[in-house]
Amino acid sequence: MSKKVTKRFSELLKKVDSDKIYTLDEAVSTVKTLASAKFDETVEIALKLNVDPRHADQMVRGSVVLPAGTGKTVRVAVIAKDAKADEAKAAGADIVGAEDFVDEIAKGVINFDVLIATPNLMGLVGKIGRLLGPKGLMPNPKTGTVTMDVAQAIKNAKGGQVNFRVDKQGNIHAGLGKVSFSKDQLNDNISAFIKMINKHKPAASKGRYIKSAALSLTMSPSITLEPQELMDLK
C-alpha cells in the first residue's frame, strides 16, 4: 500500500468511531462522508449469519430488486430460441442466442454480467457450467434467471436485481448502490435487501440470525451496524 493511500485511509479512519455500533440511519450518513476515490464508489454491506451452509436446510440464497437500482449498467445475455428469443430481444437483452452462443462462451468469451436461460435449454447451459459457476453467472431458478418469463427477468436484471448467497463461513456480501445516491435511496436499498435476507431465514437457524453487520465503500473503513435493528426489518 502506497504512502498516499495509507494517509488517505488514515484520514478516513478518523471519521469512523470503531467502538460505536451505528444505527442504519447513522451509518448511511457517515458512509457518505467517506467518499475519497476518483470514481463513484459502491456502498457495500457485509453480513455474518448464524447459519451452517454445509447443511442444505441452512443455505441462504435468493435475489432482490433494489428500489433505487444499483447504479451500474448491466449487460444481460439470454439463452433462448424462437418466440422466447424474440421476446428477449424486444425486452432489451444485449445478447440473445442458443447453441452458437454457448459455443462462444465455451471458448471463454464472456462479455455479459447476467445470464438468463429458458428451462428447456438448461441442458445446453450445463455444458458450460464449469465456466459460469465460479463467476457466479450460472442461471438458477432461485434468482429468477431460469424462467420462461424472460422479459421480466431482463427487466429485473437491468433494473437493479442483486443476487445473494451465503458462503461457507456464513458470510454474505453485496453492493447496494453508489455513494452518489441520496441518503433516502441508500436507506431504501439497504432496507429492501435486509428484508429479503430476513425472509430467507432458515427454520433451522436458532438464536440471533444476523450475528454482525458492517457498511463500507469500495475503498473505505467499515462501519459497524446494530444487528437487532436489521433483524427487526420485516
UniProtKB/Swiss-Prot annotation:
Example GO BP: translation
Pfam family, one: Ribosomal_L1
Cross-referenced InterPro entries: Ribosom_uL1_bac-type, Ribosomal_uL1, Ribosomal_uL1-like, Ribosomal_uL1/biogenesis, Ribosomal_uL1_3-a/b-sand, Ribosomal_uL1_CS
Sample GO molecular function, one term: tRNA binding
GO cellular component, as recorded: cytosolic large ribosomal subunit
Transmembrane segments: none
Record keywords, A-Z: Repressor, Ribonucleoprotein, Ribosomal protein, RNA-binding, rRNA-binding, Translation regulation, tRNA-binding
Coiled coil location: none
PROSITE patterns the record matches: RIBOSOMAL_L1
Alphabetical list of SUPFAM superfamilies matching this protein: Ribosomal protein L1 (SSF56808)
Record's subunit section: Part of the 50S ribosomal subunit.
Function recorded in the entry: Binds directly to 23S rRNA. The L1 stalk is quite mobile in the ribosome, and is involved in E site tRNA release.
PANTHER family with a match to the protein in the record: 54S RIBOSOMAL PROTEIN L1, MITOCHONDRIAL, LARGE RIBOSOMAL SUBUNIT PROTEIN UL1M
Similarity section: Belongs to the universal ribosomal protein uL1 family.
Protein name in UniProt: Large ribosomal subunit protein uL1
Protein species of origin: Campylobacter fetus subsp. fetus (strain 82-40)
Gene (UniProt): rplA
